[in-house]
Amino acid sequence: HHKMLVMQGCFRCGLYWQGLTHDLSKLSPVEFWAGAKYWQGTCSPNNAQRKAEGYSAAWLHHKGRNKHHLEYWIDYAPNGDHAMAGMRMPNRYVAEMVCDRIAASKNYKGTSYTDAAAWEYYEHSRDHYILHPETRKQLETCLLILRDEGEDECFRYIRTQLLGKKK
């Protein structure tokens, strides 16, 4: 269900290929079997694997193969001080990340989902996210538009402003 929701969101943004190929690494054995073993329906099976085993092999595999995850873009800062820093994400992956967050919120919240859910989830953890300042601004803008103006306006903004598509 999650993949279908992400695909629908990506299609609304004009990201057809990304919608079709979203999270295909979940079919790899390390991700698939962890998902099957730790599935709960109310939170990520990666969290359950992390709690049970001390780390999530599925998540470590997943984040390194999917460019719509902010963790994919963490590297050493270019200024040479060896600190970890968020690199700027290409806009199409920011858009896919928003679609992913909306879909996850719909799945986990079920009938209690509102357009504020993705922002509320982000806000709960935002202080520890390692994000490039421009990527943070783009993500927050999209999530606040979703919260305050709704899904149609959020997808319109992503399509026309973030991605620069005409329709």
Where are these regions (language model features)?
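Metal-dependent phosphohydrolase cores
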Residues: H1-K167
